[in-house]
Amino acid sequence: MRLKELGEFGLIDLIKKTLESKVIGDDTAPVEYCSKKLLLTTDVLNEGVHFLRSYIPEAVGWKAISVNVSDVIANGGLPKWALISLNLPEDLEVSYVERFYIGVKRACEFYKCEVVGGNISKSEKIGISVFLVGETERFVGRDGARLGDSVFVSGTLGDSRAGLELLLMEKEEYEPFELALIQRHLRPTARIDYVKHIQKYANASMDISDGLVADANHLAQRSGVKIEILSEKLPLSNELKMYCEKYGKNPIEYALFGGEDYQLLFTHPKERWNPFLDMTEIGRVEEGEGVFVDGKKVEPKGWKHF
């Protein structure tokens, strides 16, 4: 069997089975050490898969930190220390690496964390691996959704996918709303403003990186429940609506299946809604399995590596 036949999540299940691990399966790995609750996570960004060399190096550096911080936040933690390993072509301009680390530095200053080391190796294409350590008072994973919980998301959904499509068009000139969408793809901001809310109230939580339906399916499987989503409640930005109107697209499809938004998906009782956060109730946790949109079961078709 080839990896493309097994699939990304089939491979993860195989690794869990081989290692006999009870920890693997959340956005981070929770570890208790010297009375501290640590959250460990790692993400890889590869040239040609996650970004192109033509992208602004500072944005790539920002994103490399942000996608890891998003995992820590999703589990109710704050980022503390990072290690960065780089695979670099020998003909790469030194200025590219310098600008990459300027982006890293800006992200670390914003999220109040610190790069404490890393590694460098030669390769054909750029590869970036970030290992991040966070701390929390209460770990919130994917397996705690309760029957009757409301399902919430932060921010708006689908913007990153539209931004990527615009980038790939390689237009000579973009409209302001198009530039805003491109910015949301190149420079996502992890929702650090949600940490206290997730830590205090959420029963289950994860970030949205593979697409809403795909990630809701992960949460539903881990919690042993069904998630019902109402499409009319999905939060859509004005920029996404303008993009879809201009290019004849359906914004609901982008919200449901677009990846790399790095917003949060979480569940808790309806009455714990916080009016001071940009959270939207999009559905409910019910008895059953899988993800349903407007009463119809939907199979996940978000981002997959294999």
UniProtKB/Swiss-Prot annotation:
Binding positions for Mg(2+) 5 per the UniProt entry: D210
What more the UniProt record tells us is: Reaction mechanism of ThiL seems to utilize a direct, inline transfer of the gamma-phosphate of ATP to TMP rather than a phosphorylated enzyme intermediate.
The biological pathway it contributes to is: Cofactor biosynthesis; thiamine diphosphate biosynthesis; thiamine diphosphate from thiamine phosphate: step 1/1
MF annotations from Gene Ontology: ATP binding; magnesium ion binding; thiamine-phosphate kinase activity
UniProt binding sites for Mg(2+) 1: T42, D43, N119
Q: What is this protein called?
A: Thiamine-monophosphate kinase
Q: Where are the transmembrane segments?
A: none
User: What does the function comment of this entry state?
Assistant: Catalyzes the ATP-dependent phosphorylation of thiamine-monophosphate (TMP) to form thiamine-pyrophosphate (TPP), the active form of vitamin B1.
> Which annotated residues bind Mg(2+) 3?
D27, D71, D207
Q: Which GO terms describe its biological process?
A: thiamine biosynthetic process; thiamine diphosphate biosynthetic process
